[in-house]
Amino acid sequence: MSDPRLPAAFLQPGSSSFSDFLAVQAPDLLPGRRAVPQGHAGDLAPHGTTIVAATFPGGVVMAGDRRATMGNIIAQRDIEKVFPADEFSAVGIAGSAGLAVEMVRLFQTELEHYEKIEGSTLSMDGKANRLAALIRSNLGMAMQGLAVVPLFAGFDLASNQGRIFSYDVTGGRYEETAFHSVGSGSLFARGSLKKLYRDDLTAEQTVQAVVEALYDAADDDSATGGPDVTRRIFPVVQVMTADGGRRMPDADVATIADRVIAGRMTSPDGPTAPLTARPLEGA
């Protein structure tokens, strides 16, 4: 028996893509279908900044700082930029914060809708491709300064390993090896991880490495916020393994952040990479 409160389209079998369903039934609800005034609007909206992800044997870690900026103004000090996408994956946002959060919600619904319609979850590559399509639909706004550039990571049940995907504003999808970072402080975060990352790190060591990387990014990029010990605001950290994804409790992140800060009191530039000296030939 049909439900008179719902339009007929909601009761008919259809596409496993929720965004395809919206495109037919309510296209104005899709971010990329809205009319945008001409001109550059990038400085009119808060921007999320630095997201970092790194793999370890048995999983992957994603972390994001808590600062949002609007031009030279700190728009928010405790924004959350890392969200669970489904049970085994997470997405971190950089770019126009409002549009990015909306895209994450649509992506979460997209994955949930697919699972309900098909009775199974999308593969890791399938999830990455769905996110790429959503980013591509935002290209018009990106050309006017309202870009969304997320970082996607999760545990792949098929290959039994953590995987990381980055994107460009056109929806181009690129799988990354070992670690990656996006956002205004990403250059400094990646440079930090080049010195800190090892492929035999434990989950906790990987979390400390990404927190160190965010600290280094905040040290050189004014749009990235470091651990705020006065307000007790620390990065959001998601850990994904074969058991699923979980947000690391704030108290645990605070313990690691305090450890990082204590180390910086004696070594302001952070840990150093060990060098093995070899005698020069003929010396």
UniProtKB/Swiss-Prot annotation:
One of its GO terms (biological process) is modification-dependent protein catabolic process. Its main location: cytoplasm. The formation of the proteasomal ATPase ARC-20S proteasome complex, likely via the docking of the C-termini of ARC into the intersubunit pockets in the alpha-rings, may trigger opening of the gate for substrate entry. Interconversion between the open-gate and close-gate conformations leads to a dynamic regulation of the 20S proteasome proteolysis activity. HAMAP family: Proteasome_B_B (MF_02113_B). It holds the Pfam family Proteasome. It comes from the Bacteria. Its EC number is 3.4.25.1. It catalyses: Cleavage of peptide bonds with very broad specificity. The active site is at residue 49. Pathway: Protein degradation; proteasomal Pup-dependent pathway. It is an enzyme of class 3 (hydrolase). GO terms for molecular function: threonine-type endopeptidase activity. Residues 1-48 form a propeptide. Belongs to the peptidase T1B family. Component of the proteasome core, a large protease complex with broad specificity involved in protein degradation. Keywords: Autocatalytic cleavage, Cytoplasm, Hydrolase, Protease, Proteasome, Threonine protease, Zymogen. Residues 264-283 are annotated as: Disordered. The 20S proteasome core is composed of 14 alpha and 14 beta subunits that assemble into four stacked heptameric rings, resulting in a barrel-shaped structure. The two inner rings, each composed of seven catalytic beta subunits, are sandwiched by two outer rings, each composed of seven alpha subunits. The catalytic chamber with the active sites is on the inside of the barrel. Has a gated structure, the ends of the cylinder being occluded by the N-termini of the alpha-subunits. Is capped by the proteasome-associated ATPase, ARC. GO terms for cellular component: cytoplasm; proteasome core complex, beta-subunit complex. InterPro entries: Ntn_hydrolases_N, Pept_T1A_subB, Proteasome_sua/b, Proteasome_suB-type, PSB_actinobac. This is Proteasome subunit beta. It is found in: Cytoplasm. SUPFAM superfamilies: N-terminal nucleophile aminohydrolases (Ntn hydrolases).
